[in-house]
C-alpha cells in the first residue's frame, strides 16, 4: 500500500511542542501589551464573503486570496474566501455592530490569515497576525496614529529582543499630492506598485519600470529622488519641498506626518525614521503608513506594518468610520528571531510539572497529585507507562519545568518533592 506524503504544504509552518511554547509566549506578551494600552480583544470569522474581502483591497490581493468552494460548485462560482488580513473583516464587524459599540473603538485581534503568495524563506501563506486598530465615528484624531505605533513599539519591547526594532513612517497623501502636482494621477497605481517593490529589486530595475510606464527624464528623476528621502522630519520635509511641487494634498500629508512624529517624540519613541519608500501595498490606506524592521536584518523584510484608512467601510455603509491600525506578522517575526538567534529559545517549557509514577501501582496517586497541582493553576501531565524511570525523566525535562517522582514511599506517606530542572 502506497504511503501518503506527510510533509506540510509549502508555506505553512508547524512547530514542535517546546518551540510552540515559545511562539505562544511571544503571542501572549504581545496581547498583554495591547491590553495595557487599552485595546479590547475581539474575534472575526476566518471565512468571509469574497465580495467583502475584495470590496476595497485592490492591487495584487485578488490574485492572492484563497477562495473556498463547496463540493458541488466550481471555483468560479465560489462566493467565500479565507481572510487575507484582519482589517477588512474588522470594517464589516464595525458596520454590523456599530449601534452596540462605543467609539473610538480600540480593538485587538490575534489569529490566522491566508495569502497565496509564493512561499519563500521567512514568508508564509498561513500566518498569525497580531493586530491593533482604532476606529472612530465620523472622525479620528491623528493622536491615534501615534498611539498605534507606540503600542506596537511597546509590544516589541516585551520579549527580550537582542536587536532594536525601527519604525519607518510615511504618509500616502504626500505621494498622492506629488503625483497630482506632476499630473501623473493616471499612472499612480503603477508608480505606487513600483515604489512598493523598489527595495526588493536592483535600482536599475526600478528605473526601467518607470521608463516602461512612459515617464519623462525629469519626472523619473523626481520620483527617484522622492523615494530616496529618509531621515528626521526636518530633513525629509525640506527635501520634498525642494522638489518644487506645489499641491494642497502634498502639504496636508507633510503636516500630518510632522504631527505624528512630534507625538511619537512626546511618547518617548526615538526608534523611527521618515521614509518615502513606505507606501504599503494595500489600496485602502489613505494617510499615515508605517513598517517596522530589524535594521541589522533587513533581508527578512518588515515584521510589522499598518496605517490609516479613512474610507474602508464605504462599500458597506454611508457612515464614516475612519481608522488606523497595525499588525505584527508573528510567523515572520518568530522565524527571524529563531533563525538569527535574537532571543533565548531554550528557556520556555510547555508545562510546569510532569508527574512521573515509577510503575502502574502509583498511577492512581499520581492522578491525585496532578489534580492538586492543577488546582494551583499549574499546567501538569502524568507520564505513565512501563518505560524506565531514566527515560521518563528525560522526557519530563524536555517538556516541563519540574517533575514529581511517585514511588511506594510517596504513596505510603502521601508526600512528595518537586524536582526543578535547571
Regions found by a protein language model. Name each.
Residues 5, 58-63, 180, 184, ...:
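Short alpha-helix boundary/capping motifs
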Residues 63-74, 183-210, 294:
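Acidic, His- and aromatic-enriched active-site or binding-groove loops in soluble protein domains
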Residues 44-63, 166-181, 279-286, 388-399:
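Beta-rich nucleic-acid/ligand-interaction surfaces
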Residues 11, 89, 151, 174-178, ...:
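A general alpha-helix detector
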Residues 19-37, 48-49, 76-77, 85-101, ...:
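Positively charged, Gly/Ser-enriched RNA/tRNA-binding surfaces
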Residues 1-84, 88, 146, 150, ...:
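TRNA-binding/sensing appendages of the translation machinery
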Residues 178-185, 217, 244:
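Phosphate-rich ligand and nucleic-acid binding surfaces
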Residues 54-68, 186-188, 294-296, 399-407:
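Short, structured secondary-structure boundary patches
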